[in-house]
Amino acid sequence: MDKRIFGIETEFGISYSSPDSRPLAPEEVARYLFRKVVSWGRSSNVFLTNGSRLYLDVGSHPEYATAECDDLAQLIAHDRAGELILDDLVDEAQARLAAEGFNGTVYLFKNNTDSAGNSYGSHENYLIPRRGEFSRLAEILIPFLVTRQLIAGAGKVLKTPHGATFAFSQRADHIWEGVSSATTRSRPIINTRDEPHADAEFYRRLHVIVGDSNMSETSALLKVGTVDLILRMIEAGVIMRDMRMENPIRSIREISHDLTGRALVRLANGRQLTALDIQREYLNKVTDFVATNGAHNAHVPLILDLWQRTLDAIESGDTSTIDTEVDWAIKKKLMDGYMRRHDLSLDSPRIAQLDLTYHDISRQRGIFFLLQARGQARRLVTETDVKDAVDAPPQTTRAKLRGDFVRRAQELGRDYTVDWVHLKLNDRAHQTILCKDPFRSVDERVDALLDSMG
């Protein structure tokens, strides 16, 4: 597919610090956070004017699912927009709590684990053709996804019985299966539940569960862009070496804990390769494919360059060439400098706080955003792009139809029902409009409905 629909679903960690008032459970804080949403949407599960979905997931985790995007920069802008939307909700919840005598502080974190050992996810969605064997696609992708943490991990200080260690990935120690139709119970690498949110005759949705939430825009580009390139290669029928792993769940943990990239992975055929070997195999295949077929979008040269530089940096042990572009390397540089200046070890509570605050979505408090403001974290999209994406849907996908409908219905105070594929006014006997083509941003049926609303 030269054009593909992408989406990212992000679950956020929530916390409340209250030195002078009674503590609040995360569930209570989440209710304050969503009170404004419930007041206008009559639900904690709503679609917004930018085409995205905002809701409370299992327990107390706010979740933001981007609108359908067909460009990687567009995807990153809309993912970033979710942070701004939720940060605004934090400010309003903070004011409401203060009015009720609660003087603590609400925090939202774009990370994947909390201090109690709970994990919450960042899920990627890729539209793929229905034709072809899904099991074969999963077999080819899983070795890549197990080792992708080298280039796209968010980094984490991991507490072990032998002391603290720095790991590539936050999510790796919480994955329990290769493929599964469940997302919370078994936490697979790839979710196989067949919900395309599109015409099921032609499309399927690849739902990747294993990734970390990225603060870095270039890390997010690398995470999604590499999968897109490998999918194109598979769709073109390129033959890949058999790199199925004997035990991908054990391997994903061992790889995460070894920053040299040389952790050995035993393959199902008995061979042993390092994580770096496996990543280089995919990189070389993709590079050859692009050399033969050309780059299908303007982001491909940067994706290939950063992929190469990241693997080279891991192999050499010198991450200075990537420490403004790859989350784990940005975070490690930050921590190494802080430990050196303050004579601390990795198991210091101050380092644990630094690890957490890196993921604070507050533009005023969050350490990542302080680094970004100083030019120490590379940008791909402008702040104007992000602010535009808070209100406006992507103009080139089905999200435009949904966003325009939601906006008009809200402006006119009309009662409506909407999801990824359906649009309906509840206060008249209109037939539900079914939008099964996610690439279609113009639809005369939707135009007629909007015109009829006045």
From Swiss-Prot:
The active site is at D57. Mg(2+) binds at E9, Y55, E63. GO terms for molecular function: ATP binding; ligase activity, forming carbon-nitrogen bonds; magnesium ion binding; ubiquitin-like protein transferase activity. GO terms for biological process: modification-dependent protein catabolic process; proteasomal protein catabolic process; protein pupylation. ATP binds at R53, T66, W420. It catalyses: ATP + [prokaryotic ubiquitin-like protein]-L-glutamate + [protein]-L-lysine = ADP + phosphate + N(6)-([prokaryotic ubiquitin-like protein]-gamma-L-glutamyl)-[protein]-L-lysine. InterPro entries: Pup_ligase (IPR022279), Pup_ligase/deamidase (IPR004347). The keyword Metal-binding applies. Keywords: ATP-binding, Ligase, Magnesium, Metal-binding, Nucleotide-binding, Ubl conjugation pathway. Its EC number is 6.3.1.19. Pathway: Protein degradation; proteasomal Pup-dependent pathway; Protein modification; protein pupylation. NCBIfam families: pupylate_PafA (TIGR03686). HAMAP family: Pup_ligase (MF_02111). Catalyzes the covalent attachment of the prokaryotic ubiquitin-like protein modifier Pup to the proteasomal substrate proteins, thereby targeting them for proteasomal degradation. This tagging system is termed pupylation. The ligation reaction involves the side-chain carboxylate of the C-terminal glutamate of Pup and the side-chain amino group of a substrate lysine. The reaction mechanism probably proceeds via the activation of Pup by phosphorylation of its C-terminal glutamate, which is then subject to nucleophilic attack by the substrate lysine, resulting in an isopeptide bond and the release of phosphate as a good leaving group. Belongs to the Pup ligase/Pup deamidase family. Pup-conjugating enzyme subfamily. This is Pup--protein ligase. It comes from Paenarthrobacter aurescens (strain TC1). The lineage of its organism: Bacteria, Bacillati, Actinomycetota, Actinomycetes, Micrococcales.
